[in-house]
Regions:
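Amphipathic alpha-helical interface surfaces
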Residues: 22, 26-29, 43, 83-93
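Generic N-terminal leader/processing signal
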Residues: 27, 50-52, 78
Length: 95
């Protein structure tokens, strides 16, 4: 079952600020995620139904939430790994 993709308004602004190369890398991973969004190794324990996409080379993290009732993957936050910025933003936006 393929999930649809949605963005939190603040995450969409972050997406638009990204460089083209990073955006293309994340887009490629998001396409894979829409077919199988619940990858246990990428699950975030502190945030319910949330998972991460890591770009190791650039240090970016994308946090998404899986909503099974709507068959939707919602991008919650995109930011650098430094000081866990992406995870902190996601926690604030979901609380």
């Amino acid at each position: 079952m393929t999930y649809s993709l949605d963005f939190d308004a603040r995450a969409l602004k972050e997406w638009q600020k990204l460089g083209d190369t990073i955006r293309q890398q994340l887009k490629k991973k998001l396409v894979e995620i829409l077919n199988n969004p619940r990858i246990e190794a990428n699950r975030l324990h502190d945030l319910p139904d949330c998972y991460k996409i890591k770009l190791r080379s650039s240090g970016y993290r994308l946090v998404y939430q899986v909503i099974d009732l709507e068959i939707t993957v919602v991008v919650v936050a995109i930011d650098k790994r430094e000081r866990e910025q992406a995870y902190r933003k996601a926690g604030e936006r979901l609380s």
